[in-house]
Amino acid sequence: DADIAVWAPPVNAQN
């Protein structure tokens, strides 16, 4: 879900 990672920290982008 790279699209959601925009608002989430890159470190937890995989979550």
UniProtKB/Swiss-Prot annotation:
Q: Which domain of life is it from?
A: Eukaryota
EC no. given is: 3.1.-.-
Q: State the top-level EC class.
A: hydrolase
pH effect on activity, per entry: Optimum pH is 6-7.
Q: Any idea which GO molecular function terms this record carries?
A: RNA nuclease activity; tRNA-specific ribonuclease activity
Characterize activity with respect to temperature. Optimum temperature is 45 degrees Celsius. Activity decreases sharply above 50 degrees Celsius and below 40 degrees Celsius.
The alphabetical list of record keywords is: Hydrolase, Nuclease
Assembly mode: Monomer.
What the protein does comes down to: Has ribonuclease activity towards yeast tRNA and polyuracil, and decreasing ribonuclease activity towards polyadenine, polycytosine and polyguanine respectively. Lacks antifungal activity against M.arachidicola and P.piricola. Inhibits HIV-1 reverse transcriptase.
What else is on record for this protein?
Inhibits HIV-1 reverse transcriptase with an IC(50) of 300 nM.
Q: What is this protein called?
A: Ribonuclease
